[in-house]
Amino acid sequence: MKIIILFILSFPALAFAKLQIATTTTDLAAVVKKVGQDQIEVFAIAKGTQDPHQVEAKPSFMIKLRSTDLVISQGLELESAWIVPLIHGARNPKLTSKDGLFELAAELDPIEIPKGEISRAEGDVHPGGNPHFQLDPIRLGKAAQLIAKRLGDLDPSQKDFFQKNANTFQKEMTEETKLWQERIKKSGVSEIVTYHKTFSYFCDRFDIRCAVQLEPKPGIPPTASHIISVIEQMKKRKINVVLIENLYEDSVGAKLKNDIPNVVVKRVPVSVEGEPGVSTNEELIERLVKAVEDGRH
């Protein structure tokens, strides 16, 4: 009799246990929340104000991962320096299996895939392409579809629920993108300068050229000679908008303001929760679109 009572008491907890999801970034956590809603619990390892290339593999993260069903990452080696050590340190069989880490970027038509041999002399180059798809709303919609399928595999009873939510999110992203594209086109801004190649997908989606970075090479801090070259290019090509990711110091921005008349330098978030008031993927893209609009002719 006691055994039967214990089974009955434990059944609700088993039946309604929520999936425990970890993401490497706040951007992915925001998408997972849209797809999973009240049927999942999710936490992001990197903060929205952190450079996802450089996150400390803390023991506290390993403890959290011990009860996690799945880790979702952007991939393409963005988090490779720390996510694998964290997973191994957690000693969670669910995560060390081949399906424990779900990397998204490779499934989302990556851009800027380098050709030929790659050496460290070229900076922090990602062999599989640029991993920063979080600033492209269309790819975020596709990511939601991939996430819904994986969550449905883990919890088949909620498969239709996850799929419905992913469809809704993707539709919203598609509709918002059309409006954002119209606004950027109306702004007249066709080219910007950025610190790192974080904006490549954003620029590609919104038809903005962003071939000039303040970094001489990916992951290499700006040098005096390179900044002189950047200023020359900006004057020659009449670029008057600079977006500096708030992950990096912006002392270079002051120099650009001194050397280039009417230049607009904006320090902006590039992840959800990267600054107050940016708690969703939509709010992040909106923030960046407004930053571009501020540089209108």
Segments and roles (model prediction):
Residues S10-P12:
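N-terminal signal peptide c-region/cleavage motif recognized by signal peptidases
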Residues K18-H297:
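Extracytoplasmic metal-acquisition and chelation regions
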Residues M1-I4:
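Positively charged n-region of N-terminal signal peptides that target proteins for export
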